[in-house]
Regions:
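Secondary-structure end/capping motifs
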Residues: 235-321
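Sec/Tat signal peptide C-region and signal peptidase I cleavage site
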Residues: 18-25
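Short, glycine-/small- and polar/acidic-enriched structural segments
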Residues: 25-175, 191-197, 214, 221
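Short glycine-centered helix-capping/turn motifs at secondary-structure transition points
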Residues: 49, 76, 188, 207, ...
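Conserved C-terminal helix/tail region of periplasmic/extracytoplasmic solute-binding proteins
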Residues: 306-350
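Bacterial N-terminal signal peptides
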Residues: 7-17
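Pocket-lining segment of extracytoplasmic ligand-binding domains
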Residues: 179-275
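Positively charged n-region of N-terminal signal peptides that target proteins for export
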Residues: 1-5
Length: 350
């Protein structure tokens, strides 16, 4: 009886040892992420174990903006990071930051926006109700989270469509967190804001100001965020980065499917609620499909990012000191290899 009793214990011990060995053998990726639904593909892949399945241990540090992760990225504390397409990114690369963009992490695809313009109820009552009315924003205060951000780019593109000079015809209120901008709108401290869609949704529901134009209308296919890697990490650990991309792209497929029909994918909705600032699955469902769109082949929207660099160079703004080339900014081979291997190897069964 003692011998029979030892067999299960031995099996358990061997199993635990194997699991511990697997954990030790997993390749570590130190990643900066932010709690935003545009990164849904990553959150899904992480929650469903796709990175683990491909032998990766993704260790996440949370940042509220990709720009805030740059110092840790440059110092070598991080291997990869979510990275917003902002003026600071171009300046960092121009100064030698070892950053290369490898994957799409959300953009304003027509029908699947992530950003939205809200205006005060007073302005809406005066007839500012769509992009066609942006001319009435002349002389008004427009709030965005940061100077040179995707939000400022979107709002500026809308002002240009209305024939306004975005540098001179409005007063920019910058470097204010989006939740605070939402409240400032309700208090009349700003006249218009460009926010993540869920903040615009909250503002409208709280009667602080209606949504009047989404980012897919202002700047169709505008890049919201990307994944970037340190160049030295990519060179030394290319297969690790490709496997990261494979797991991520599987998550992206499920993210896009759920955005179109959230009722069909309750588990995905719960994952997104728990991983983001939204927290409430009902809100996640309510704002669908306005979660952003990520390309299922992983390709970043190169033309959009290069357009942003041109925009911040002039003639209206001069936030980028020196332009960088497409070759300096991107390594598109990672997405290509990851998609090819995902289709060929089918590690997730589909």
């Amino acid at each position: 009886m003692k011998i029979l009793g030892a067999v299960p214990a031995l099996a358990i011990g061997i199993g635990a040892a194997l699991l511990a060995n697997d954990a030790r053998c997993a390749d570590v990726v130190r990643l900066a992420e932010g709690p935003f639904i545009s990164g849904g593909g990553f959150f899904i892949a992480q929650a469903l174990g796709y990175f683990n399945k491909l032998g990766l241990d993704v260790q996440v540090r949370e940042f509220q903006d990709g720009a805030l992760a740059v110092p840790s990225f440059v110092s070598g504390e991080l291997d990869m990071s979510f990275m917003t397409a902002n003026a600071g990114l171009f300046n960092s690369v121009a100064k030698g930051a070892p950053i290369v963009i490898i994957l799409d992490r959300g953009h304003n695809r027509p029908g699947r926006p992530y950003t939205v313009i809200n205006v005060t109820q007073a302005l809406a009552d005066q007839g500012v109700r769509s992009l066609a009315d942006f001319g009435k924003l002349k002389g008004k205060r427009v709030g965005v989270g940061a100077l040179g951000s995707i939000n400022q780019f979107n709002a500026a593109k809308g002002l240009l469509k209305a024939g306004l000079d975005p540098a001179k015809d409005v007063q920019w209120i910058v470097n204010v967190p989006q939740p605070d901008l939402m409240k400032m709108l309700g208090q009349g401290q700003v006249d218009a804001t460009d926010l993540a869609y869920h903040f615009g949704f909250f503002a409208q529901n709280n009667k602080w100001g209606p949504m009047i134009a989404t980012g897919d209308v202002l700047a169709p296919n505008g890049q919201i965020a990307t994944f970037a890697a340190r160049r030295d990490f990519l060179v030394k650990n290319r297969d690790v980065v490709v496997r990261f991309a494979m797991a991520y792209l599987q998550g992206v497929k499920e993210f896009n499917a759920a955005a179109e029909n959230p009722a069909k994918y309750p588990r995905i909705v719960d994952i997104l609620a728990n991983a983001t600032t939204l927290k409430n699955p009902d809100v996640v469902r309510a704002i669908a499909p306005n979660w952003s769109y990520s390309n299922e082949d992983g390709m970043p929207v190169v033309d959009s990012i290069m357009e942003m660099q041109d925009f911040w160079t002039g003639p209206y703004f001069h936030l980028v000191e020196k332009k960088v080339t497409q070759e300096e900014l991107f390594d598109l081979s990672i997405a290509k290899e990851a998609k090819a291997r995902l289709d060929r190897e089918k590690p997730f069964g589909n």
